[in-house]
């Protein structure tokens, strides 16, 4: 069995993967794939932020597909007889409180000090670092992953 990940071992691994200070990076993550980590998702986030430094920006998807019509849900499917109850009682999207379904690391990142979240109710992103405000400031509703979104900004930044 491999040893547990630590902040310093993750720093080395991220350096070996090519992360450097001043980078803007978007990270899709799985704590299970990272492996057992001392300190859990917070250690992974600290390692990522440490790798890119104060001049870098870390971005993660923080989608919340459950803030939608339940008849379109695939995971989890709910019985059709529940649709109306869910529609009438589903809380509205709030960037500060609506959880993400993108995993433990993304959920911890969403609430990490200094992290900002875009305002799209289904496909928001969170960012922390020098360009966080610039990346999350405007997120068009019509084209959720195209022009006028954080994804366009990431493309323009060669992230």
Annotate each PLM feature.
Residues 1-159:
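N-terminal and secondary-structure boundary signal
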